[in-house]
A protein has these predicted regions:
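SF2 helicase catalytic motif II
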Residues: 56-64, 69-119
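Motif I (Walker A/P-loop) of helicase-class P-loop NTPases
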Residues: 1-3, 26, 107
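Glycine-centered short loops/turns at secondary-structure junctions
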Residues: 9-10, 60, 115, 188
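Flexible beta-alpha connector loops of hexameric P-loop NTPases
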Residues: 37-46, 89-101, 163-171
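Switch/connector loops and helix/strand junctions flanking conserved nucleotide-binding motifs
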Residues: 22-24, 47-50, 74-75, 90-93, ...
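Conserved interdomain linker/interface between the two RecA-like ATPase lobes of SF2 helicase motors
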Residues: 106-191
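Conserved motor-coupling elements within RecA-like helicase/translocase cores
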Residues: 27-65, 73-79
């Protein structure tokens, strides 16, 4: 998708939840995209960040920006793809200092404003994103096999609000969850 976007003259914003993950992904992307890749995050000095900002405003902006939350605020002249890797991570939430925001939500809004596509990546999507996929608001691509062929978990969405309204819950856990935990423990499995 990144290569296709670049070939069509578009720009890509690739967001990671933590700066520590940047180095690993950067090496892979640098091998493919070379000097078309720009890295942007809060650990860079002010001077380094200003240089990236200036290049984004130039006639030769980066085709791909890889970064953490702060990369959302860079200028893009032709943003066409936004990738939010590990979208479920809580570190996408900016608490302090203000402004407080959720980078995943901000990325979706930025993409909407720019007419860009959004790819939310996660092997364990947030409940919000998974619900949006189940209701058709988002598309869903499922991983059918896991690393070393580990069995995929069965996911069951339970409307606990409805269960509470019908007085079918005595605590914070649904009857289905309690039954599954009891069954796992009875079989000697982890729960």
């Amino acid at each position: 998708l990144i290569d296709k976007t670049l070939r069509e003259g578009g720009q890509v914003l690739y967001l990671l939840p933590e700066i520590a993950l940047t180095v690993q992904i950067m090496k892979r992307l640098r091998n493919v995209f070379g000097d078309r890749l720009g890295i942007y995050h809060s650990k860079y000095s002010d001077a380094e960040r200003v240089e990236i900002w200036k290049r984004q405003l130039s006639d030769n902006p980066y085709g791909v920006i890889l970064g953490a939350r702060s990369a959302l605020f860079l200028p893009f002249s032709n943003l066409r793809l936004v990738i939010v890797d590990e979208e479920h991570e809580t570190s996408f939430k900016q608490q302090d200092p203000a402004p407080r925001y959720h980078a995943r939500s901000a990325a979706i809004m930025l993409a909407s404003m720019c007419g860009a596509k959004v790819l939310l990546g996660s092997a364990t999507p947030s409940a919000e994103s998974y619900s949006n996929a189940l209701t058709g608001k988002y598309g869903l691509v499922s991983i059918m096999t896991r690393y070393k062929n580990i069995q995929l978990p069965e996911i069951q969405v339970v409307d606990v609000k409805d269960l509470r309204r019908r007085k079918m819950m005595n605590g914070p856990f649904s009857p289905a969850l309690l039954a599954a935990v009891r069954e796992a423990l009875a079989d000697g499995r982890q729960a």
